Structures are given as structure tokens and as C-alpha cells.
Swiss-Prot record:
The modification Phosphoserine is found at S138, S238. Gene3D superfamilies: Transcription Factor, Ets-1 (1.10.150.50). SUPFAM superfamilies: SAM/Pointed domain (SSF47769). Its main location: nucleus. It comes from Pongo pygmaeus. The gene is SCML1. Putative Polycomb group (PcG) protein. PcG proteins act by forming multiprotein complexes, which are required to maintain the transcriptionally repressive state of homeotic genes throughout development. May be involved in spermatogenesis during sexual maturation. This is Sex comb on midleg-like protein 1. Coiled coil: none annotated. Residues 136-160 are annotated as: Disordered. Keywords: Nucleus, Phosphoprotein, Repressor, Transcription, Transcription regulation. The lineage of its organism: Eukaryota, Metazoa, Chordata, Craniata, Vertebrata. SMART domains: SAM. It is found in: Nucleus. Belongs to the SCM family. One of its GO terms (cellular component) is nucleus.
């Protein structure tokens, strides 16, 4: 049986024959027409319309969510690129700081530009004045240092160079053929024993010639020039003897008792070219003799900001100072 809601136009009515002739029953078969099999019903309920609208809204929301997800993926990629660039910049900055480090003293003492330039100029003048010795050009005079900047305190030479320039006397043809067995280097500075020449004449002490023989002047002049050339090592055996900051003999015996100025003087006179730039740094940190002996290459490089070559030289001089070999001629 076909439902009442179905229309007779949409179906095909077919009579089914019966094999029983006595039976008056008539059977019909109903089949849907092919053109109406896939045809949607014309009448749509309100509930189905609402469902389609909801599905459309959900699809729109899903599409927007997909767009947002794609945008977030792009942002993540860009953030990764930015992080790599920032890390690269940080590594480059750290490398530049390590290679171009300033001295440790400049971190605590930041002067104004004008004041800093003025101090540097004054210190440069002090360095030039400390190494200017107007009387030290003679090989026979001891090296003397200034105690103050005033020119009145400069030491005056006790004798002139003209005393050591021998006059060339006329050579006697008779004495020139007789060799002298005595050499002036056999006598010390305070040896006053008389010596003899080949002609038997006796001369006085080595402090001055005797009269009576023209050969005596030439022997005395030769001895004075040889002795004068050999005398400066004994006179200038220590460059610190005439300094006002250090007592005589204390610079080589007790380096642990040095003051800051004594350490500065040690730097200036040991290696002026390499160690003079460290004078201001040592003064600012107040490095005395005890601190000087405790310095190592790691402390100089990491904490004081000294260059590698200067640190190696200073450690070498400190080791020689500990062994007592720094002031050997």
C-alpha cells in the first residue's frame, strides 16, 4: 500500500495477475517513476532551513580559523628569523667588546673630556721631563735625576770633559823604540804603588803625572782615558741611586718594601717604551712592591686590561726581580 502523502502522479500502478481463477482478489504494484527518484521534495521544513544556515556559519568560522592559523604560522617563522638575527648581533657585540676592551681604570674614573686631556698632557710632560738628562751625554759622568721640577736643584758636574782629553805630545824617537812593560789596566783606581818605565825613571801615583820625563805625560794620559772609559759601570751600576723616592741599595734588596712611586720608577727605567703606558694604571690602583710581586698574567689581562705583549714583558721583569737578576749589568 502506498502512503496517502504520496501522489499518484509520482508512481506507476501495475496490476499483478493471480493464478487462482476462483479468487476475486486484485493486486496492484506501485513503482516510483525514474524522473522522481532523485528529485528533492518541494516542501522543506523550517528546521532544515535553520540547519543549513548553521552549517554555513560554521563553515565561515572554520575558514576564518584556518586563515588565522596560517597567519600565526607565518608569524612564528618571522619570529624565528628575528631571533637568529638578534643572537647573531649579540655574538658580534660580545666579540667586539672582547677584542676592543678599554682599560679597567676607565670604568671607575670617568673624567670630563677637557679634564682628561689636561691630565694626559701633564702626565706626558712628566714622562718627557723624567727622561731628559742634560748632563748624561758624557760617557764619563754619572747619570743624575731631578728631584724637583725647579731648575735650581739640577746637579752640576764636578769636572769637565777637557780633563779627559789627552794632548798628543811629540813622540821621542829614542823612547819610541823602547817598549814599556807596564800597562795602565794592571792598576786599580786606588792603587798608589809606584811603577817603572824602561828607562828606570820612577813615577808617582796614578792620580797625576810626575815631571822630568816627556814619556810620563803620555803614559798618564793613556791611563786616564782607559780608566775613564772603564769607570762608568762602577759609577752608574744602578739607575736608581740618585732618585729621591728610593734609598740607596733598597731597590735591589727589598722590592716588597717599595712604594707606588718606586714601582712607577721601576717601570720607567726598566723598559720605558713598553712599560711607561702602565704608569697611570699602577698609580690609579695604588700598586706597590708587594702587589707588584703578586701580579700574574691572568690578573694583568682580565682585571687590568693590559695587552698581551706588555703583560708578557712585565711578567718576565717581575720574575727576574724575584730572582734578583733584574739589575745585573
Amino acid at each position: 500500500m502506498m502512503s496517502n502523502s504520496s501522489s499518484e502522479i509520482d508512481v506507476v500502478k501495475t496490476r499483478i495477475p493471480t493464478y487462482d481463477e476462483d479468487d476475486d482478489t486484485i493486486l496492484y504494484a506501485y513503482e516510483t517513476k525514474p524522473e522522481f527518484v532523485n528529485k528533492e521534495p518541494n516542501i522543506v521544513s523550517d528546521a532544515s532551513c535553520n540547519t543549513e544556515e548553521q552549517l554555513k556559519t560554521v563553515n565561515d568560522v572554520l575558514i576564518h580559523c584556518q586563515v588565522i592559523y596560517d597567519a600565526m604560522q607565518n608569524l612564528d617563522k618571522k619570529i624565528d628569523v628575528i631571533r637568529r638575527k638578534v643572537s647573531k648581533i649579540q655574538r658580534f657585540h660580545a666579540r667586539s667588546l672582547w677584542t676592543n676592551r678599554k682599560r679597567y681604570g676607565y670604568k671607575k674614573y670617568s673624567y670630563r673630556l677637557a679634564k682628561k686631556l689636561k691630565l694626559q698632557k701633564m702626565k706626558k710632560n712628566e714622562v718627557y721631563e723624567s727622561f731628559s738628562y742634560p748632563e748624561s751625554y758624557s760617557p764619563t759622568l754619572p747619570v743624575s735625576r731631578r728631584e724637583n721640577n725647579s731648575p735650581s736643584n739640577l746637579p752640576r758636574p764636578s769636572f769637565c770633559m777637557e780633563e779627559y782629553q789627552p794632548a798628543e805630545p811629540e813622540e821621542d824617537p829614542i823612547l819610541s823604540r823602547t817598549p814599556s812593560p807596564v800597562h795602565p789596566s794592571d792598576f786599580s783606581e786606588h792603587n798608589y804603588q809606584p811603577y817603572y818605565a824602561s828607562d828606570g825613571a820612577m813615577y808617582g801615583s796614578s792620580s797625576g803625572p810626575c815631571l822630568g820625563n816627556p814619556r810620563a805625560d803620555s803614559i798618564h794620559n793613556t791611563y786616564s782615558t782607559d780608566h775613564a772609559s772603564a769607570a762608568p759601570p762602577s759609577v752608574t751600576r744602578s739607575p736608581f741611586e740618585n732618585d729621591c723616592y728610593i734609598k740607596e741599595g733598597s731597590i735591589t734588596k727589598h722590592p716588597s718594601t717599595w712604594s707606588v712611586e718606586a714601582v712607577v720608577l721601576f717601570l720607567k727605567q726598566t723598559d720605558p717604551v713598553a712599560l711607561c703606558p702602565l704608569v697611570d694604571l699602577f698609580r690609579s690602583h695604588e700598586i706597590d712592591g708587594k702587589a707588584l710581586l703578586l701580579l700574574t698574567s691572568d690578573v694583568l689581562l682580565k682585571h687590568l686590561g693590559v695587552k698581551l705583549g706588555t703583560a708578557v714583558k712585565l711578567c718576565y721583569y717581575i720574575d727576574r726581580l724575584k730572582q734578583g737578576k733584574c739589575f745585573e749589568n
